[in-house]
Amino acid sequence: MHVYSVTPESASRQREFTQDYLTRLRETGAACERAGWSGILVPHNLHEVDPWLIAGQLGAATDTLVPLVAVQPSSLPPHTAAAMAAAYATLYGRPLHFNLVAGARDDELRRTGDRLGHDERYERMREYGLVLRALLRGEEVDTEGRFYSYRGFRLEPRPEVLSQCKLFVAGSSPASIGVARDVADVVVTHPARYPEWEETFLKPLLAGGYTGELGIRIGIVARSAGEDAWVTARERFPETWQGRQETLLKTVSQSAWSRQLAVDAVAEAAAAAAAAASAESGESAGAAGEKEPDVYWLGAFRSGHASAPFLVGSHQDVGSRLAEYLRAGVGHVLLNGSYEYDHEDIGRALLAARRAAGS
């Protein structure tokens, strides 16, 4: 199992930072290496620091960590992305991976003038991925596409380590599954609860001919006692009026995974409210108050401060739930919103997952 942390936020509405961003970034990278994790996700958002500058700092501050750099095709052409990977490999003697994203925030797409529809953005991503993969392999690119055209272009210089770069494709829609089949080394999704994820994502993916690796983006809050994990999770991701409104807006997002998570998050909140009302009225004879919360939790997404579901509970409970995905073939776990002092507890949950999955 390959585990990836995520770069720290440069700014937050929730937290006041006592250290400058560069210090926090370097400490996060060092903590990931100590934990034995494979890499660190570097997101692409208009409100975050440029991902390529971040990747360079991580290369300078770590020895083995591999940045997983999010790339939105509208932000730079594939030959530039390949050249950036070549520069990174020349400086630090190791590859980096690419997380190809179509864009999940409708507001950012509008602000940058990206007017392509959902499926068109994935058509562009397919062309992008095919060109990028060819350049990383050292092939000459000669193509006339709808979005990209090249005449006898080859990446030079090209460090041999670029052959180890992987393309991750994020998404869960039929359009993204088609692109994953054609260009992805690893397909990544923000998973639903395991039975639904298997039925609505994994089976269609495999039926469509995908033969690559699997990844999931998920957060973890784990403690020795499940009750302590829930206290931490609810303090860290408090529900607010603004968060609920943002979640409602996401129910009509163009992004399939964001839209589905939002719909599920609203349903989860409604079910919890109904259970609380039932307990107050005495209809459940106290049973509702004694029921353990589900390990799979969308409250962090609903708060507006996380983009993925979370697994919350004891190390064993979180490990058991994560193991369901591992047994299905997931080999890459991209963590969402892990705090620097969470690494030890996350490591224990990951170890429990490996044991439960028999890996």
What function would you assign to each model-found segment?
Residues M1-V66, Q164-C165:
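N-terminal beta1-alpha1-beta2 module of alpha/beta enzyme domains
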Residues P51-Q72, R124-Y128, Y210, G347-S359:
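Alpha-helix-loop-beta-strand connector modules within alpha/beta enzyme cores
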Residues M1-P8, I40-V42, L65-V71, L96-L100, ...:
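Hydrophobic faces of well-ordered beta-strands that scaffold small-molecule active sites
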Residues E48-A55, R193-A207, H343-E344:
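Active-site-adjacent beta->alpha loops and helix N-cap segments on the catalytic face
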Residues A30-R34, A55-T64, A85-L96, R181-D182, ...:
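Acidic (Asp/Glu)-rich catalytic clusters
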Residues T112, H118-P159, W197-E324:
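An alpha-helical appendage that flanks or caps ligand/catalytic pockets
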Residues V3-T23, A70-S74, V161-S172, R223, ...:
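Active-site mouth loops of central-metabolism enzymes
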Residues R24-P43, V179-V187, E324-G331:
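Catalytic domains of carbohydrate-active enzymes, especially glycoside hydrolases
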